[in-house]
C-alpha cells in the first residue's frame, strides 16, 4: 500500500501543452455545435412564428372577402383590413432574418418568402406584378419585377422610377413617381400620396389610387388610364383617360400642341373641368374650351378650386386655405366662389391681383396661434404691387370684413395699403369691425418715394364704431404717409363724408383724401346714421 513520493509528484503534474491544445479544440467544437444548434433552433422558431402570422393574416383577409364580396384594390387596403384587427403589418418585419412578406393580389393572401425569394408559406401569383413586396428599399422598388408597397418610415429616394406597380403606403416623402413600360404589356396599379405622377407606357393600362398634385399621362394603351384618387390636374398627351366614380379631379388638360386624335376623355364625375381643343371627345365632365396656359391651369387646380387665372377664367377660391395661397401665387385674376374665413392676414405684395368678390364675403378671424402683424384682412404694397377689387355679382353683396379684435397700436382694417402699393376698388362692401378702427387704411413712411395710391370708384364703406366720436372710414397714418393719396370717384360711406375730410394733422408727412375731379357728394339719413354717396358729375 504506500505511494512513493515520486509517484505523488507525478500525480500532481498538470496538462502538457499538447493535451491543453486538444482540450481547447474539443471545447471549441462543442461550442460551435451548440451555437449552430441554438441558431438552428432559433431560426426554426422564428420561421414557425412567421408562418403562424401569415396564416392569421390570410384568415382575416378571407373573412373580409367573404363578408364584402370584394378583394382589396390596393396593398394599402389589404393592410388596413388586417390593421383593423389589431395587426400592424405596415411596420412588421418577419422575425426570420432576410425573410420578406408579400401580398398576392390575385389570390388575396399574404405570402412568406425566404432569403432567396422562395415561398415558405402562402402562394405567389404566376403574374409577377400581381405580387406586392412589402419593403423599405428604393433599390428593391426600382429593380424588382414584383410590385412594391413602401413600409412606413421610408427614408429612400424622393424620386422613383418604376416599371411595375407601386403603393407608397402612408409615406408622403415620395414627391415624384415615373412609370414606364417594360417588355411585357400589363395592367398595373399605382398609388401615391401627393407629388407628381408621370405615366409613359403606350402598351399598358394604368389605374391610380391615392392622391397627386399632378398626373402627366404621356402615353397609355388604348384601353385607358383610370383615376380613382384625388388629383388636382391630369395633363393628357395621348391615350384614353377615365375619371371613375368616387374620384376627385379638379381639371383635365389637353395641351393644344398634342395630336387630338390620340386623346379621349370620359368622366363619371360630372363637375370635372376639361380644357381641351375642340376636336377632343369628352364624355361627361364640363368642357371649358382650349387651354391657354397649361401651367396656369395646373396651378389653379393644385392651389385653388380651378381656373386659369385669366379675366375670362379666374382662379376659383372656395376656402380660406385657398385664399391664403394667393400670397405665394402669381399675378392674375381671382374669384370668390364661397363665403370664406381666413385665419391670417393676406399679403399681396409686388404682384398685380384682381379679386372678384362675386357676391361672397371674406373675413379675418385670427387662428389660435397666429400673431397679428399689420391687422388688415388684405394687404397690398411693394414695387408694382396693385390690388383691384370688383364685385361682378348681381346682388352686389360681396364683402371684405376686418377683424373683430381690437389691438393696441394696430388698425384692423378691411384693406391696408403699404409702401408703393396701389388699390383700386370698383365695388363690394368693406367693413371695419373692431373698436374705433378704419375701413381702408394707408401706412407707408415719411419718404414720398414710397407713396401709396388708393382710387375708389364704387362700393359701400363703413366702420362699426367711432374713435373719440369720429368715424375714420378712410384713413392715412399720421406722419407716415408722405405723398400718399386716397381719391374717391364713387361709393357710399356711412357716417363719413370724404368730400369734406381734413387730415389731422395737416402736414407734408401725412397723405391726402379728396374727391375725384368733377365728383359731388349727396347724403341721406337713416335714424342716427348719415350715408354719403359720391358720384361723378
Predicted ranges, named:
Residues 1-15:
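N-terminal leader/signal peptides at the extreme start of proteins
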Amino acid at each position: 500500500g504506500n505511494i512513493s513520493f515520486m509517484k505523488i509528484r507525478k500525480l500532481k503534474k498538470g496538462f502538457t501543452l499538447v493535451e491543453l491544445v486538444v482540450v481547447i479544440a474539443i471545447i471549441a467544437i462543442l461550442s460551435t455545435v451548440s451555437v449552430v444548434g441554438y441558431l438552428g433552433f432559433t431560426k426554426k422558431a422564428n420561421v414557425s412564428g412567421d408562418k403562424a402570422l401569415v396564416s392569421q393574416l390570410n384568415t382575416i383577409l378571407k373573412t373580409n372577402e367573404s363578408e364584402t364580396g370584394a378583394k382589396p384594390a390596393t396593398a394599402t387596403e389589404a393592410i388596413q383590413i388586417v390593421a383593423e384587427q389589431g395587426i400592424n403589418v405596415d411596420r412588421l418585419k418577419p422575425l426570420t432574418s432576410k425573410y420578406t412578406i408579400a401580398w398576392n393580389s390575385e389570390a388575396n393572401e399574404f405570402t412568406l418568402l425566404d432569403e432567396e425569394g422562395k415561398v415558405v408559406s402562402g402562394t405567389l401569383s404566376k403574374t409577377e406584378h400581381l405580387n406586392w413586396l412589402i419593403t423599405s428599399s428604393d433599390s428593391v422598388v426600382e429593380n424588382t419585377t414584383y410590385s412594391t408597397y413602401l413600409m412606413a418610415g421610408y427614408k429612400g429616394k424622393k424620386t422613383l422610377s418604376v416599371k411595375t406597380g407601386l403603393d407608397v403606403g402612408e409615406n408622403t416623402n415620395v414627391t415624384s413617381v415615373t412609370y414606364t413600360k417594360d417588355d411585357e404589356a400589363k395592367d398595373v396599379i399605382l398609388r401615391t400620396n401627393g407629388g407628381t405622377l408621370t405615366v409613359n407606357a403606350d402598351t399598358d393600362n394604368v389605374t391610380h389610387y391615392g392622391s397627386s398634385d399632378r398626373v402627366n399621362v404621356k402615353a397609355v394603351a388604348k384601353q385607358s388610364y383610370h383615376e380613382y384618387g384625388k388629383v388636382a390636374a391630369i395633363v393628357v398627351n395621348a391615350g384614353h383617360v377615365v375619371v371613375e366614380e368616387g374620384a376627385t379631379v379638379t381639371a383635365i388638360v389637353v395641351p393644344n400642341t398634342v395630336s387630338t386624335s390620340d386623346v379621349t376623355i370620359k368622366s363619371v364625375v360630372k363637375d370635372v373641368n376639361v380644357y381641351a381643343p375642340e376636336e377632343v371627345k369628352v364624355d361627361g365632365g364640363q368642357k371649358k374650351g382650349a387651354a391657354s396656359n397649361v401651367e396656369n391651369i395646373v396651378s389653379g387646380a393644385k392651389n385653388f378650386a380651378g381656373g386659369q387665372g385669366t379675366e375670362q377664367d379666374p382662379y376659383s377660391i372656395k376656402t380660406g386655405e385657398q385664399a391664403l395661397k394667393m400670397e405665394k401665387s402669381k399675378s392674375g385674376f381671382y374669384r370668390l366662389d364661397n363665403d370664406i374665413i381666413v385665419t391670417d392676414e393676406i399679403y399681396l405684395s409686388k404682384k398685380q391681383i384682381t379679386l372678384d368678390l362675386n357676391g361672397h364675403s371674406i373675413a379675418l378671424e385670427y387662428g389660435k396661434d397666429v400673431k397679428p402683424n399689420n391687422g388688415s384682412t388684405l394687404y397690398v404694397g411693394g414695387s408694382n404691387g396693385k390690388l383691384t377689387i370688383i364685385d361682378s355679382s348681381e346682388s352686389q353683396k360681396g364683402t371684405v370684413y376686418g377683424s373683430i379684435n381690437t389691438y393696441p397700436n394696430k388698425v384692423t382694417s378691411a384693406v391696408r395699403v403699404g409702401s408703393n402699393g396701389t388699390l383700386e376698388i370698383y365695388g363690394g362692401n368693406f367693413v371695419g369691425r373692431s373698436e374705433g378702427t378704419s375701413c381702408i387704411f394707408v401706412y407707408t413712411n415719411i419718404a414720398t418715394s414710397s407713396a401709396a395710391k388708393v382710387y375708389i370708384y364704387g362700393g359701400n364703406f363703413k366702420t362699426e364704431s367711432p374713435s373719440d366720436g369720429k368715424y375714420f372710414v378712410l384713413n392715412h397714418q399720421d406722419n407716415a404717409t408722405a405723398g400718399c393719396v386716397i381719391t374717391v370717384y364713387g361709393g357710399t360711406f356711412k357716417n363719413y363724408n370724404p368730400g369734406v375730410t381734413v387730415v389731422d394733422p395737416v402736414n407734408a408727412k401725412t397723405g391726402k383724401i379728396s374727391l375725384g375731379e368733377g365728383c359731388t357728394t349727396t347724403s341721406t339719413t337713416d335714424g342716427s346714421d348719415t350715408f354719403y354717396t359720391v358720384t361723378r358729375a
